Amino acid sequence: MAGAAILAVNLKVTGIGNDIEVSNSQALTVPVEAMSGYTVVDTATTTAIQLFDFVTSIALAKIYGVYLKAVKGTIYIGVDTAGTGTITNLTADLVLNEGEATYIPVNPEGNLGMVIDGAAVTDAVQWVILGAA
């Protein structure tokens, strides 16, 4: 999504004596990369999913935020961690029950990553990952 957006405003005022018409446009840079998706955690309870497994075009060092929503079941999140070991309700930094959502800011300078797991192999998470262009 990085690129440019054009903001255009056209204003026309009539009926007050002197008609006025003003047009203006401005190019705005959009310095954000974003990816989103829906993932069924089919390896739940055996292998967690690492954050960078979700993204294909944003480097881990460029990621600055993650929106997560538990669409089905219970989602376990481990922050500032790497690896694919399993996470439980006792070891998770954050637990999202079905329907709950959260935004997690990510420190790209000192972040090892993020790991997401589920309580069952049918649990699913919806995600949006934001990164600097």
Task: Report residues per predicted region.
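Extracellular and analogous surface-interaction loops
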Residues: 49-60, 104-108
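C-terminal interaction-tip segments
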Residues: 2-21, 25, 117-133
